Amino acid sequence: MNYELIFLAAGQGKRMNAEKNKMWLDLVGEPIFIHALRPFLADNRCSKVIVVCQETERKHVRKLMQQLDVAEDRVEVVKGGSERQYSVAAGLECCGLESVVLVHDGARPFVTLDIIDRLLLGVKQNKAAICAVQVKDTVKRVIHDVVKETVDRDNLWQIQTPQAFELHILQKAHRLAKKDQFLGTDEASLVERIPYPVAIVQGSYYNIKLTTPEDMPLAKAILGELGGKVND
């Protein structure tokens, strides 16, 4: 099953305490987002990559794609929005080559082809699928610094990206969100409102999102554990 990829690289460095877009921070010799993009570039089923980035970085991204020998007709670089949801919407405007679209965070550098395989199977069976891992820690609901209850974690999952959808479903979800002025935290939260059932497939505890400075040493350790290869 072929697919198009909306690759989100328009992030900022506020929580990372970085002076530049965290996507460009170095992770063992390469920008974070290049590690996140490589598995898709290595996947022949990925027919088109839409990189959504800041306007000021579009030229740099195009140059980097050339250095990676990515075919010019395989990648499109577009301007992102002020919110993640608006960036995905900008990417959706460039889709239409395939019936399936994946959305991935450029700040998740440890996605694997195994995860992509499971997602494509999930979207084939359910039309909407996201990867996730079950919550390990005890979770408590807290109000005004006081514990109100301990939440049953048996049905709690930490949601990751990529997330996969039939294109028409994600387009419909975005149209409804725009109409209702709803702002979600991920694509699945929009699709759930249609409403449409979203299937879960197994992600990886390695598939972390790099958000704060504490994440960088962990990322280097994960990369070392994986032998510098995250494509397998």
UniProtKB/Swiss-Prot annotation:
InterPro entries: IspD, IspD/TarI, IspD/TarI_cytidylyltransf_bact, ISPD_synthase_CS, Nucleotide-diphossugar_trans. It catalyses: 2-C-methyl-D-erythritol 4-phosphate + CTP + H(+) = 4-CDP-2-C-methyl-D-erythritol + diphosphate. The record marks 153, 209 as: Positions MEP for the nucleophilic attack. CDD domains: CDP-ME_synthetase. The keyword Glycoprotein does not apply. One of its GO terms (biological process) is isopentenyl diphosphate biosynthetic process, methylerythritol 4-phosphate pathway. Pathway: Isoprenoid biosynthesis; isopentenyl diphosphate biosynthesis via DXP pathway; isopentenyl diphosphate from 1-deoxy-D-xylulose 5-phosphate: step 2/6. It comes from the Bacteria. It holds the Pfam family IspD. PROSITE patterns: ISPD. Its EC number is 2.7.7.60. One of its GO terms (molecular function) is 2-C-methyl-D-erythritol 4-phosphate cytidylyltransferase activity. The keyword Transferase applies. Keywords: Isoprene biosynthesis, Nucleotidyltransferase, Transferase. The record marks 15, 22 as: Transition state stabilizer. Catalyzes the formation of 4-diphosphocytidyl-2-C-methyl-D-erythritol from CTP and 2-C-methyl-D-erythritol 4-phosphate (MEP). Belongs to the IspD/TarI cytidylyltransferase family. IspD subfamily. This is 2-C-methyl-D-erythritol 4-phosphate cytidylyltransferase. It comes from Listeria innocua serovar 6a (strain ATCC BAA-680 / CLIP 11262). The gene is ispD.
